[in-house]
A protein has these predicted regions:
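Tubulin/FtsZ superfamily GTPase core signature
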Residues: 1-373
Length: 373
């Protein structure tokens, strides 16, 4: 039975996170261990052994007749056929679901080929469908990147909203040494915080309340999406948290030019009106002048001096991989502490070679993050 979020006397919103393939399954396992609440988890894989160690509430072995539980062998076509073979099982797991996050590492077999089929089924069932996928590291090779790009292009046509995390950006997320293991945890945090934030928005009654209809208005049939959560404390915390929410170094998008944006500001009862205005104004300045803006505010006494800003932006004209304009870098708050969120998890099997030698438009943003303690 799905986990229900009460949003009113007669309304329950059911949210699921589905990890497809090895990378997607690993994301689900880490999210379960982190204590993410308000959602149910589903693991989908051709690899029976991987499913046996999954922490998901539901486990679906796809393509049993085709692969005999041995995996897809990095062949997206095998992944696609396996998901097609198991359509009924996937549909069953999605019953009574209102919103689904599909996570997969693009470039391999099961995730690349199977995730678009899972998305297609979800959309056919009328479920708000959001995908958070990763692109391979450069060292994983040209073929894997080509498969990833093809899988992402197919996903874009199957989902309501799509968030892309290029694994290559992980090395820019911090100036500290990143191990191969914790690199994936950093990427997972993008999805975890986005999922937790949305479930909290729907579940918790705020001073200015947001509900599932608001989330749907921004994310339904929206194409590329940006999901970010910024946290900061101390001097200038409102602007710092907002800046981090709109410019995660892990994402392939910024919110510039977005035509739909949901902004939620959370703080203690002591949060000042001026701080709320600063955070909202910074976000508004970056989106399209005529953007549909939905604003919410909540109180959380556990935050003390901290402020949290959640931003979901959609309605971009730019396509995945198209260069983004360079954003102006602002000085970080001297005493603030911030956690960069962002949108999504990673696949440990996904890694490919980036041959792009043009200047990275996020360089200035990376410098801001790397200055922080």
């Amino acid at each position: 039975m799905a986990f229900g979020l009460e949003t009113g006397p007669d309304t329950v919103v059911n949210i699921k996170v589905i990890g497809v393939g090895g990378g997607g399954n690993n994301v689900v396992n880490r999210m379960v261990r982190s204590g993410t609440k308000g959602v149910d988890f589903v693991a989908v894989n051709t690899d029976k052994q991987a499913l046996n160690v999954s922490s998901a509430n539901y486990k679906i072995q796809i393509g049993e007749k085709l692969t005999h539980g041995q995996g897809a062998g990095s062949d997206p076509e095998v992944g696609r056929k396996s998901a097609e073979e198991s359509r009924n099982q996937i549909s069953k797991a999605l019953e009574d679901t209102d919103m689904v996050f599909i996570t997969a590492g693009m470039g391999g077999g099961t995730g690349t080929g199977g995730a678009p089929i899972v998305a297609e089924i979800a959309k056919e069932m009328g479920i708000l469908t959001v995908a958070v996928v990763t692109k391979p590291f450069g060292f994983e090779g040209r073929r894997r990147m080509q498969q990833a790009e093809a899988g992402i292009a197919e996903m874009k046509d199957k989902v309501d909203s799509l968030v892309i995390i290029p694994n290559e950006r992980l090395k820019h997320a911090t100036d500290q040494k990143i191990t191969f293991a914790n690199a994936f945890e950093i990427a997972d945090d993008v999805l975890r915080q986005a999922v937790q934030s949305i479930s909290d928005l729907i579940r918790d009654t705020g001073f200015i309340n947001l509900d599932f209809a608001d989330v749907t208005a921004i994310m339904k049939n929206a194409g590329m999406a940006h999901m970010g959560v910024g946290r900061a404390a101390g001097k200038g915390k409102a602007e710092e948290a907002a800046r981090m929410a709109i410019s995660s170094p892990l994402l392939e998008t910024s919110i510039e030019g977005a035509k739909g944006v949901l902004i939620n500001v959370t703080g203690s009862m002591d949060i000042g009106l001026e701080e709320v205005e600063q955070a909202a104004s910074l976000v508004q300045a970056a989106v399209h002048p005529d953007a549909l803006t939905i604003f919410g505010a909540q109180f959380d006494e556990t935050l003390d001096d901290e402020i949290r800003v959640t931003v979901i932006a959609t309605g971009f004209d730019k396509q995945p991989g198209e260069p983004l304009p360079k954003m102006a870098a602002a000085e970080p708050a001297g005493e603030g502490t911030a956690a960069v969120p962002g949108p999504m998890p990673l696949n440990e099997e996904d890694v490919d070679k980036s041959e792009d030698t043009e200047p990275d438009p996020f360089d200035d943003i990376f410098k801001i993050f790397n200055k922080r303690d």
